[in-house]
């Protein structure tokens, strides 16, 4: 079976969804920009040699509809002979895109794929056009479709206090801002055109979603966002609304060597699981355990983790039950996470994987694990190994 390697991984800056940098930039343009940039950074691979493009996106309507993967590829002037497909596993969409491409390469059906994802939550809101089947209420609580309430449930079940959530959220912003100041994101962020507050066109090379002034004291003043009476989850301890895209060049190890391209990491194992929709945020725990089992590894073998921060109330139970609560500052989301950077749904799987690869190189560790919860009760995880 072919070994699957990541040759390169990039992303756009994360733009604020409400009146942010990309308010006049479409999702297809963010995607096409990364497709062009990834190919330009790796000229040894001709675009025509791509076997397929897998692109994650959740809200596949309006500008994100009608197979945005193909639309973006056409905008990027990728040769018409290269196919493209849009993948949807909600929050895990672009990580699923990576898994789909990896399996194609493992079986010999492909040698080189471009994968990634996008979500413009400012142009296509998360709830746009959603119409749940009324029959779901027979066996799934209505609140299971409300992500904030599932986070509240996890907080109650695992004893996650408001103070713990506020502290974790403040940490996310502090670490993301420190990473920005130290240029830790420089190798992954591709400068992307947008508009500043005055409407002037400029190139953005930083995440505008981060709030460096965030403190525990300021977060403590916010009201609960989802359960006004008994809740602890606030807007400040939830992932920010943002617009962005991320992309990865995935190849067979043999093809990468043929072309003289240096792989950055191997895909060691992959896993997807289901869980109760009412505690959808717990999905990373069984997904990570299954991915580690497939890789023949244990939690202690992993040098760094990227765990998507849907909510502080959601990620803290996962960290606790993976036995990592005492190692947060050594291993978990060292450059901040979605609370500070935002969670553009279809983008986030590729985004956290991209950040993870850079952290693995910076920390000089052999193994890294990226994992996410998924709305309606799923979890997804990928173990990467440095080459």
From Swiss-Prot:
Report the domain of life of the source organism. Answer: Bacteria
Could you give one GO CC term from the UniProt record? cytoplasm
Q: Kindly give the PROSITE patterns that the UniProt entry links to this protein.
A: THIOLASE_1 (PS00098), THIOLASE_2 (PS00737), THIOLASE_3 (PS00099)
Q: What is its EC number?
A: 2.3.1.16
Q: Which Pfam families match?
A: Thiolase_C, Thiolase_N
Report the main location listed first in the record: cytoplasm
Associated pathway: Lipid metabolism; fatty acid beta-oxidation
Point out the gene that encodes the protein.
fadA
Instruction: Give the family from UniProt.
Output: Belongs to the thiolase-like superfamily. Thiolase family.
Q: This chain belongs to which protein, by name?
A: 3-ketoacyl-CoA thiolase
Q: Where is the signal peptide?
A: none
Q: Where in the cell is it found?
A: Cytoplasm
List the InterPro entries hit by this protein, alphabetically: FadA, Thiolase, Thiolase-like, Thiolase-like_sf_Thiolase, Thiolase_acyl_enz_int_AS, Thiolase_AS, Thiolase_C, Thiolase_CS
User: What is annotated about its quaternary structure and interactions?
Assistant: Heterotetramer of two alpha chains (FadB) and two beta chains (FadA).
* Organism name: Shigella dysenteriae serotype 1 (strain Sd197)
């Amino acid at each position: 079976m072919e070994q699957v390697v990541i040759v390169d991984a990039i992303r756009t800056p994360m733009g604020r969804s409400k009146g942010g940098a990309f308010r006049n930039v479409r999702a297809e343009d963010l995607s096409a920009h990364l497709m062009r940039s990834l190919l330009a950074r790796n000229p040894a691979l001709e675009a025509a040699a791509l076997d397929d493009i897998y692109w994650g996106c959740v809200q596949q309507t309006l500008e994100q509809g009608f197979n945005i993967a193909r639309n973006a590829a056409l905008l990027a002037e990728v040769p018409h002979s290269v196919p493209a497909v849009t993948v949807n596993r909600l929050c895990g969409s672009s990580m699923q895109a990576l898994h789909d491409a990896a399996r194609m390469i493992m079986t010999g059906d492909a040698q080189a794929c471009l994968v990634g994802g996008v979500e413009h939550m400012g142009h296509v809101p998360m709830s746009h056009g959603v119409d749940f089947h009324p029959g779901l209420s027979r066996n799934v609580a209505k609140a299971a479709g409300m992500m904030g309430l599932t986070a509240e449930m996890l907080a109650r079940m695992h004893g996650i206090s408001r103070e713990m959530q506020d502290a974790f959220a403040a940490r996310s912003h502090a670490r993301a801002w420190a990473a920005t100041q130290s240029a830790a994101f420089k190798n992954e962020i591709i400068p992307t055109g947008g508009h500043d507050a005055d409407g002037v066109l400029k190139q953005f090379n930083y995440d505008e979603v981060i709030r460096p002034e965030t403190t525990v004291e300021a977060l403590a003043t916010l009201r609960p966002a989802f359960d006004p009476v008994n809740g602890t989850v606030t807007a400040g301890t939830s992932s920010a609304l943002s617009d962005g895209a991320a992309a990865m060049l995935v190849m067979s190890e043999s093809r990468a060597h043929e072309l003289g391209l240096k792989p950055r990491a191997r895909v060691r194992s992959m896993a997807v699981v289901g869980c109760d929709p009412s505690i959808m945020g717990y999905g990373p725990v069984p997904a990570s355990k299954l991915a580690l089992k497939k890789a023949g590894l244990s939690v202690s073998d992993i040098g760094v983790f990227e765990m998507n921060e849907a909510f502080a109330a959601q990620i803290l139970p996962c960290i606790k039950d993976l036995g990592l609560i005492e190692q947060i500052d050594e291993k978990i989301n060292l450059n901040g996470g979605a609370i500070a950077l935002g969670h553009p749904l279809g983008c986030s799987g590729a985004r956290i994987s991209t950040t993870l690869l850079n952290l693995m190189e910076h920390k000089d560790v052999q193994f890294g694990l990226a994992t996410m919860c998924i709305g309606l009760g799923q979890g997804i995880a990928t173990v990467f190994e440095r080459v």
